Amino acid sequence: MADIKSLDDLKSVVGDAPVAEAAVTREPVRDSLGRSYATGKRKDAVARVWIKPGSGKVTVNGKPMDEYFARPVLQMILRQPFTVANVTGQFDVMATVAGGGLSGQAGAVKHGISKALQLYEPSLRAALKAAGFLTRDSRVVERKKYGKAKARRSFQFSKR
């Protein structure tokens, strides 16, 4: 190793090291109709979601959101991405969802809306990612094992 006694000596040895490039600038992804498309998943449910600028109308499988998801909790889950991104009432959503139950379907649509929002407007990515909406929730039902009543529950045991 060369005798390095000062900062100038170090610079002469290292030379011009490549400087790390700035973060990737993402471009909006939209189709010919001005919509962004994304798929969302949760448990066994898979949702295909299209968003476009509009009045905030949400349609799921051809029905209004409050008709398809009757429980207020499920409707709140669908509204969360818009609330976090501060764009409530600015986008129309058209979603088709299949598989799983209502809770899983609501989670899948929420995941799809979040992904579509960040594709439509990349500046919203930071807020959605911080809230954890862009991450696929990988929790699924644990399989039943043989020799057990359920996934973990054992059959009743009688000592005598």
Curated annotation (Swiss-Prot):
The keyword Transmembrane helix does not apply. One of its GO terms (molecular function) is structural constituent of ribosome. One of its GO terms (cellular component) is cytosolic small ribosomal subunit. One of its GO terms (biological process) is translation. InterPro entries: Ribosomal_Su5_D2-typ_SF, Ribosomal_uS9, Ribosomal_uS9_bac/plastid, Ribosomal_uS9_CS, Ribsml_uS5_D2-typ_fold_subgr. Pfam families: Ribosomal_S9 (PF00380). SUPFAM superfamilies: Ribosomal protein S5 domain 2-like (SSF54211). Keywords: Ribonucleoprotein, Ribosomal protein. PANTHER family: RIBOSOMAL PROTEIN S9, SMALL RIBOSOMAL SUBUNIT PROTEIN US9M. Belongs to the universal ribosomal protein uS9 family. NCBIfam families: PRK00132.1. This is Small ribosomal subunit protein uS9. It comes from Cereibacter sphaeroides (strain ATCC 17025 / ATH 2.4.3) (Rhodobacter sphaeroides).
